[in-house]
Amino acid sequence: MKRTFSVIVLFLLYCALCAFGYAASHPSAPAGKRTVAEILREIGPRAESRLKPYFDKAGVSYPPSRVTFIGLKDELELEVWAEKGRRWVYVATYDVYGASGGLGPKQKAGDGQVPEGIYNVTELNPNSRFHLSMKLDYPNGFDRLMAQSDGRSHLGGDIYLHGKTKSKGCIAVGDRAIEELFVLTARTGIKNVKVVIVPYDFRSHIFHSAIRITPSWLPDLYEKLGQELANYGQRDHI
């Protein structure tokens, strides 16, 4: 009887050790995975304590109905505008710490260029290695159409607004700023957020001599972007 009991104990111990070894070598899920909801609970309160004074000063309710981020490549700035009634109101400006390449649009994978155009946010990434990030829908319809007319392929992708201070082909605004932009986008709804990226502020300059990438369709793109920026006025006069 004692021998049978000992065999059973040894068998159960063996099974437990096997199970432990399997679990150790086959983790069920990577550690540290967070959801957008968790970010809003953990980071939301402190980010919104910094955000709301901007909206109070601008006279816009928070969260707003729609938001536009304007990325100014030459100025290394990201403006935030919110819809109030039928007009757009300036809210805040963030510094851009990292944006590789020069003035001019992105045309292919690996060129290091930050895209230029009007984009939507398609994804909020709470597990980015750049703290937090927001994915843009580059290449958009215009990008694809111009690539087709040029006979180009391999346009690249995975363009983000993200934290940290360095980037290649994306826009890095630092951890503090991306927390605010991430929370603002989540509260507003990604379908209500637009991102306009321009080589320089068309509201202040007519043409910038530093532009070296000049495909035949560039004037059409810049005319379109200029018309878009005209909806937001000049922030210095607000």
What are these regions (language model features)?
Residues 26-62:
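Extracellular/luminal recognition modules and glycoprotein regions
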Residues 110-238:
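Exported/periplasmic cell-wall-interacting domains
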Residues 19-25:
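Boundary at the C-terminal end of the N-terminal hydrophobic targeting segment
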Residues 8-18:
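Bacterial N-terminal signal peptides
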Residues 50-68, 80-81, 96-110, 114-121, ...:
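N-terminal post-signal-peptidase region of extra-cytosolic proteins
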